[in-house]
Amino acid sequence: MESSNPTTPAPIATYIAAFPPEVQARLLAVREAIRALAPRAEERISYSIPTFWQGRNLIHYAAFARHIGLYPGAAAIEVFRAELQAYRHARGSIQFPLQEPLPLALIQRIAAWCVDNNNARPVSAPPARPGRASAGAAPGRTRR
């Protein structure tokens, strides 16, 4: 089943379409909740799952056999630790069971925090590539 939203990027729509309709609906709800708070973010597949990216990864989400996974990073888990007690969570991930209602308000608060945290951090330039040694002797060696 293709996404009902024609603006869903093709790789994301393909990812979502691979799941049963009830899981697709949950993935779309998570996507829309995050998109509302990260309108400038680019959507892409990273680590084989849907990702919102804005100079760096903001937040990922994914579907599994028994849960929807949300991956906001370790710092977000620490900030929202008290609100996450009802859910399985680890260093940078949260599991929302498929048989329970999605906590969309919590997902939006986490997404808003991720956007704010990202906007507060400068985007670092990629590291400069070291120059190539000229053909000939290796550094520190002389020719005879």
Write out the residue ranges for each language-model feature.
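Charge-dense, helix-prone N-terminal extensions
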Residues: 1-144
